[in-house]
Amino acid sequence: MKNSLKMKNLLPALVITMAMSAVMSLCIAPNAYASKWDAKMTPEQVEATLDKKFAEGNYSPKGADSCLMCHKKSEKVMDLFKGVHGAIDSSKSPMAGLQCEACHGPLGQHNKGGNEPMITFGKQSTLSAEKQNSVCMSCHQDDKRVSWNGSHHDNADVACASCHQVHVAKDPVLSKNTEMEVCTSCHTKQKADMNKRSSHPLKWAQMTCSDCHNPHGSMTDSDLNKPSINETCYSCHAEKRGPKLWEHAPVTENCVTCHNPHGSVNDAMLKTRAPQLCQQCHASDGHASNAYLGNTGLGSNVGDNAFTGGRSCLNCHSQVHGSNHPSGKLLQR
């Protein structure tokens, strides 16, 4: 009899304890519930729900405190406060306004079990890149991003979060030492070129991809910072700019006619060695073609001279970037 009474007295406490354990499990393991709606809702349903939440504007009166009740156990979440987006003393930081909800959208009923979706970012997000980027662009609207719409990255459905990290002390893509690693995680062909024997000093962090390119888009074909390829090259190689008294058309028109800007197995990042490189244009007058015959059975008919001896146009035409010498018409001096 005493044991049965004792059990009756313990039951309410047991029920309360189990209920509290269930609630605590939501808070202690936020990663298990943070995007549980993905398994139950299609991407279209997620977007429709988010649109409805924004229309209702049901933001939490407690701001980040509401979010941290569950998410403070996540190291990734808390790393936000180590970076600029989590700065509480900056008027430009999300923390100065709607805080977490400035990026992830209104809380709504999300904290009632975590079933109602929030905006998520990155590869695991079911939201389109356009939807994700619209959140970032609502703040980041400076002149460097004026050409984002229609840029190479925009047309490839690249999300801001594909390159940028927010919940970190320092975004790797904004560091000169790690920017190239971020870019070449997608641009693998360029990475291979950068590791060839002749290349720009990106491997040693003496320059970065953004020294030449604007990743947010520009009016040029390769999203360059300057209006043209040549203007981009001249920003470092000013001695090649000209105008020269005697000019070489490939130099004035397009540097990449001869050079591979990301790297090459040939000296000076040339696409191929001379004379083959020169013969791509100078093949009809017979002069340059004669040198090539030296590698065939007809080589004995070419004759011995400085040109055929080294089989390089550069033995004579040394000033290929142009000449200011009065008698430099043939770019020989």
From Swiss-Prot:
Gene3D superfamilies found in the cross-reference section: Flavocytochrome C3, Chain A (1.10.1130.10)
Alphabetized GO MF terms: oxidoreductase activity
Signal peptide interval: 1-34
Entry-linked Pfam families: Cytochrom_c_NrfB-like, Paired_CXXCH_1
Keywords for the protein's UniProt record, in alphabetical order: Signal
Keyword Secreted set for record: no
Top-level division of the source organism's lineage: Bacteria
NCBIfam families: decahem_SO, paired_CXXCH_1
Name of the molecule in the record: Multiheme cytochrome MtrA
Lineage of the organism: Bacteria, Pseudomonadati, Pseudomonadota, Gammaproteobacteria, Alteromonadales
